[in-house]
Amino acid sequence: MTPYIGRATGSNILNFGYWSEKTKDPLQAQNELCRLVGEFANLNSAKKVIDVGSGFSAPAIHWKSIYSLLNIICININLLQLKTATKLVSNTPGSDTKTLSNAKEISFVNAAATILPFVDQCVDRVVALESAQHFKSLIRFIRESKRILKRDGLLIIAIPVITTAKSLQQFMKLGILSLTWASERYKLTNIKSMIKSAGFKIIEIQYIGSHIYEPLSDYYIQNRNIIKHIILKGDSSYFRTILYDIIENIFYKSALKMKEVYQKGIIDYVLIKAH
């Protein structure tokens, strides 16, 4: 759903966003989640940060604008996204992002999350902002994170989760959302077990689903016609409009289901901090 709404907002940020009473739109919510994760990760005391599954590196750009001394390395297996991110950071033609005065301290590596190309104990933070659910496999990423983190380093994971042992069966009965949740569906208990088995100690878990699922669903439901107008603007051919209506109806039903499963306590969204 976030890439879909992102097309309407023009955002390069690939996360659900953190919504409050003051939040006006998805872009503001997405930036707020980046800010929240930066604070949760104690980036103010870090020097070298690995952003794994970095997307278009919008979180890295956001963090660098706040924590100017950070050296951020963006890891992404998607080469096309990395090339786009490079343009965004360097402000080459085709990018509308302002050049960062210290952009040279944001770098890019095309690699898998499960084989991180770094020596042992070399980084202060490993951050996976809404990306770890896509890693194959999650435990290998966690073990690699343990290997490259310094002794006082932190692993930070922001991730949507299944909340109870029975939830997976309940989730599979909820129809279309099972199809549009395009990632692994991890139970929180399993994630905690993997983190501990890799030698980490969990310091803190924040449950922020109340600021994620319902407000995002409500925004989409309330603004679906506006979003349609923006996406189809300049190209509203009959065939494209019909195709859009089919796809949009799927996302609309998914938004309703996402709100429903959160209200039933089947899913949540957590921030995990471990060392």
Predicted regions: what is each one?
Residues M1-Y18:
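N-terminal, positively charged/glycine-rich alpha-helical extensions of SAM-dependent methyltransferases
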Residues I13, Q28-S45:
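Conserved alpha-helix/loop element of class I SAM-dependent methyltransferases that forms part
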Residues R125-S137:
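A short SAM/SAH-binding and catalytic strip from SAM-dependent methyltransferases
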